[in-house]
Amino acid sequence: MGTASSLVNAGEVIEDTYGGGGGEDCVIPVEVKPKARLLRSSFRRGPRVIGASFKSTASVDLEYAAEYERLKKEYEIFRVSKNNEVASMQKKEIKLDEENKRLRAELQALQKTYQKILREKESAVEAKYQAMERAATFEHDRDKVKRQFKIFRETKEKEIQDLLRAKRDLEAKLQRLQAQGIQVFDPGESDSDDNGTEVTVPSTQCEYWTSGALGSDPSMGSMMQLQQSFRGPEFAHSSIDVEGPFANVNRDDWDAAVASLLQVTPLFSQSLWSNTVRCYLMSTAETQAEVEIFLRDYSPKLQRMCETSGYFFQMVFFPEECESQHFAVRKWEIEKSSIVILFICSSLPSCLQEDCEEAFLKNNEAKPRLIYHSIEDGRSDSDGLKQLLEQDTNKANKTKVVDHCGDPVEGAYKLYCHLEQVIKQDLLGIEISDPDAKDESATMEDDDYGDVLWDVHDEQEQMEAYQQASQSICELGFQKYYDRLNDLVAAPAPIPPLLISGGPGSGKSLLLSKWIQLQQKHSPNTLMLYHFVGRPLSSSSEPSLIIKRLTLKLMQHSWSVSSLSMDPGKFLEEFPHWLEKLSIRYQGNIIIIIDSIDHIQQSEKHMKWLIDPLPVNVRVIVSVNVETCPQAWRLWPTLHLDPLNSKDVKALINMECGGANILLTKEQERKLERHCRSATTCNALYVTLITKLLTWAGSTGKIEDVLQQCLQCQDTVSLYRLVLRSVQEVMPSAKEKEFMREILCFISVSHNGVSECELMELCPGLTWEVLTSLIYHLYTLVLLKYTCGLLQFQHLQAWDAVNLEYMQGGQNIISEYREKIIKHFTTQLSHDRVTWRSADELTWLFQQQGEKQKLHKCLMNLFVSQNLYKRGHFAELLSYWQLVGKDKISMASEYFDALKQYEKNCEGEEKMTSLADLYETLGRFLKDLGLLSQAVTPLQRSLEIRETALDPDHPSVAQSLHQLAGVYMQSKKFGNAEQLYKQALEISENAYGSEHLRVARELDALAVLYQKQNKFEQAEQLRKKSLKIRQKSARRKGSMYGFALLRRRALQLEELTLGKDTSDNARTLNELGVLYYLQNNLETAETFLKRSLEMRERVLGADHPDCAQSINNLAALYNEKKQYDKAEELYERALDIRRRALSPDHPSLAYTVKHLAVLYKRKGKLDKAVPLYELAVDIRQKSFGPKHPSVATALVNLAVLYCQMKKQDDALPLYERAMKIYEDSLGRMHPRVGETLKNLAVLRYEEGDYEKAAELYKRAMEIKETETSVLGAKAPSGHSSSGGDTYSVQNTLPVSVFPE
């Protein structure tokens, strides 16, 4: 027996089985054993029954034994599993602790590494900044050293030139002393070598320049010195230094002629050089029907015809009731007009007599005139009309009378046909005799300019700006400025640009233009490159167009045709290289003048080349306003224009008032003098404007009132505002005053101005009477001017005054007027009228308005983009696309899509030809963007269209082949390019002949291609062939500016010489003869040269040297026409005059001797040629000294003549002497030495000395190989034996001669 505690093991749990669900498990501690008494008492349930058995008492516990055992086992299992889990968790805890410690250690290591890397990064960044600072310092030092070296080089070159010039002077003096019989010790006879001067001169051949190689040229160093060290005929690089069809013209003659023609063109009357065809129409009441039909039906046709050629067409007329009014305005209009038309019946009304007298009888410039004479049955002409017709037609043959009797419609058509012919022939210069003239004209335009894209209007604008700037006759106090400018030209190089500064209106433009005139007059060999910058944001202030124009101006003095990159950034890179190249070859000074350079956007950025030292013979002059001059330029030498002093103010006032027959009182003069003493009132523009205003008011008798108002104006802008108010007061009605405001506002908000015909459309209700009267007043008061047919403000102060007076509404009013201009040009586009005006104005206005979607739509007009691109406005076109937010690929894609859409509607040859042009333009545009792979597709499509729509052998197919080959060449696909170039060459030769400029262009392209493939010999041969073609054609690419405009006005030039006989008129006739001669128009040239000769003989006498000039040119013309007998007679006559009139060493005498000698040789009169060749040697020895290369050249030519006469013994010493001169002066490895060696080899070969001949020929070939290997693409010409002065032996060794 035992107690209940014996049933419970230590630590076991006894569950409460009695209960009501709220019991808890109890753990009975077994360490404390319960007392027996307590245990016994716990089982008592009342009175104890004695005698009860133990079994009966414990039977209840035994019933749960099995359950107990099961629970015990489960518990044991549970306990063991939990113990295992606890043990496992403990192990995991230990493991996690270890992992945690490891990760913490790694984290600490990473943090240390990060800190180390961070410190290294900071150290590297610091090192980077230090390296950049060192690099910047090094670059600065390098540029400084480079500039110093260039200055040193240029200085030394100048010193060498001075020494060589002094040497030549001493040699010439020595020759004169020896000629006088004075014995002088000749250092050249000494055995000492101390006197030898070895000089190396580059070849005188015209190099072939490519834009891509510009930056890789070596330093000009000795080239500058040596190019100018020898001044002989073959070393004198003329602007037209050529052989060929006009090689016989005295080089001085055509140099002077061309220079004079190109310089005098801008100084003609405005109607001769304007790009506006202005017709002044007069009519009577009887012919009103014809006038109305003509204006309605035919005036628009003439307008479209002129627009196609880039001209404005304006038909100006006054109503009949106004004929007796506004005589000054009508007279001004007649003077401006390029043609006058008179509709008349049988009588001349009195109201038209003044106009007819002004237009027909005072037509000093012999401008075209048309008279439509309506004849009616039974009515005879009045005496006044008969007198007009007889006087005018007898005086000058420029008036055409169109007689008509019958239907007014037929009469109007008849007049239209005559007027169209006059405009085309006399004003536009279009030949209409050939039915295919239009196509040929377009072709010839392309021939003239090649791949160079330029805008004729940009050049026209500069010519007019120069002409207008030089119109003033006031040069008060300019002489001191002229002297300073002359000192700049004469100062030793190198020197920085000269800065001309002054306040607004101080006369900077006038000073520069007047000085340019003086330089052109007194220094014809000086090349003047000028640019007058207009108002800010105009085309003339666009930096890319300025640099491009100056680059093209430099290129025009080279025979080579280089493809000029359209990338604006490359202009800046290539311009200094072109400047340096030309400075080496040009014999005179090169002066670059940029007026108002501070108006250029970001002028310091785009004119960086001004900072670098300039070549020796280059001078740069720029003008700026004092307030806006960049700080970096203020260190340059500065010529500041001082304000006018009292004396100058008084002289200017008297000059202006005297010219207008206005007399001021002494009191009025004193008031003006006292007023014009402040800084803002004593400048030239202010004084000029105030006197103009007083003279203008003098006609109304309100001088005193206007003077009082002027005295209240303290600056030029306020004075211009007074001008505006004064003109507005004379307008008779409020409507006309509103027209004035609108016109000035339109001009103010436009890009480059507005034309009169555009104003007539922009201002409904505006009449020619009102418009011309208003413009006359504003032009007289120096507020408006004409530029390229557009009305612009003469000065920035006038623009400011208009803005202050009429544009007070700010941006709103500006936008309002711009929208009207946009609407006008948009309407033109909707009618398929795309002109240079709509392309320029619309795109710029959209840009200024910020209307990107409209700008994008405008750019997607294929003809607008084509117009901009083909006129060379590539930079603007690119900037517009950038504003729209399109990159190059997007541009290409959108143009492709637009072209495909346009192609769907193309039918007919004309449309397909236009489509081909668009595809070609797109291909060239993409090529200029650098998208060569994308450019191939449109060029191929252009080629396909032209081959299909026209003919596989059409010249335009050659154009497509040429452009496509250019892309392949840039892509280095030389095989494809060569094949296409050869196809283009074949087509061009078949279409134009072998001596056309198109052929020369293909030869040039092939030469560049061979050069890139290192095929220098083939490239050189093609260059020579191309050069001869270009020399024969005489329409050099570089003359595109002068000659392109000059050819259009040649007839007006001719008319200027119809007056009385003068030496100036005779000179002009000679120059016109040279001009036509240069164009191979020999018949016309002969006429002018004969007229020049006859006039000179009458005015100057038959033995005057000027007569010899005309005779010499006539002889050259007959020589070209192969009329050798006439040429020989004239050459002999010219030689006789020049021998008697000129010094023995005069260049003109030398030229005549040369040409006559060549003619004698050509005719086989070798005995007559010998003394002339000997005389040529003698002249050159006297002119240049016995050791000059020119003397060697003359000796070679004389030796060749002796060989031709089989006098080898006489030729041998001449060859040896020539070779000695060449070796001493040019170096033993110079090409001239090699050519002389070849000639000596021929001579030895003919004498039978084959061993010596082989030795000489081997040495000549070594020189040739050395020359090719060293110079590569610039290998000088070997001077082949072809040409006028050539003798060749028909054997293995050709004899070569050198041009004289």
Curated annotation (Swiss-Prot):
Q: Where is it mostly found?
A: other
Q: What is this protein called?
A: Nephrocystin-3
Q: What GO biological process terms are annotated to this protein in UniProt?
A: cilium assembly; convergent extension; convergent extension involved in gastrulation; determination of left/right symmetry; kidney development; negative regulation of canonical Wnt signaling pathway; regulation of Wnt signaling pathway, planar cell polarity pathway; Wnt signaling pathway
SMART domains xrefs = TPR
- Which Gene3D superfamilies is this protein grouped with? P-loop containing nucleotide triphosphate hydrolases (3.40.50.300), Tetratricopeptide repeat domain (1.25.40.10)
Which parts form a coiled-coil structure per UniProt? 82-183
SUPFAM superfamilies this protein is in? P-loop containing nucleoside triphosphate hydrolases, TPR-like
Originating species: Xenopus laevis
The record's annotation in Pfam families points to: NPHP3, NPHP3_hel, NPHP3_N, TPR_12, TPR_7, TPR_NPHP3
Where in or outside the cell it occurs: the entry states:
Cell projection, Cilium
Keyword Cell wall biogenesis/degradation present in the record's keywords: the answer is no
The job of this chain, per UniProt, is described as: Required for normal ciliary development and function. Inhibits disheveled-1-induced canonical Wnt-signaling activity and may also play a role in the control of non-canonical Wnt signaling that regulates planar cell polarity. Probably acts as a molecular switch between different Wnt signaling pathways. Required for proper convergent extension cell movements.
UniProt entry tagged with the keyword DNA-binding: no
The cellular component terms of Gene Ontology attached to this UniProt record, alphabetical and capped at eight, are: ciliary base; ciliary inversin compartment; cilium
Query: Which InterPro entries does the entry link to?
Result: NPHP3-like_N, NPHP3_ab_dom, NPHP3_hel, P-loop_NTPase, TPR-like_helical_dom_sf, TPR_NPHP3, TPR_rpt
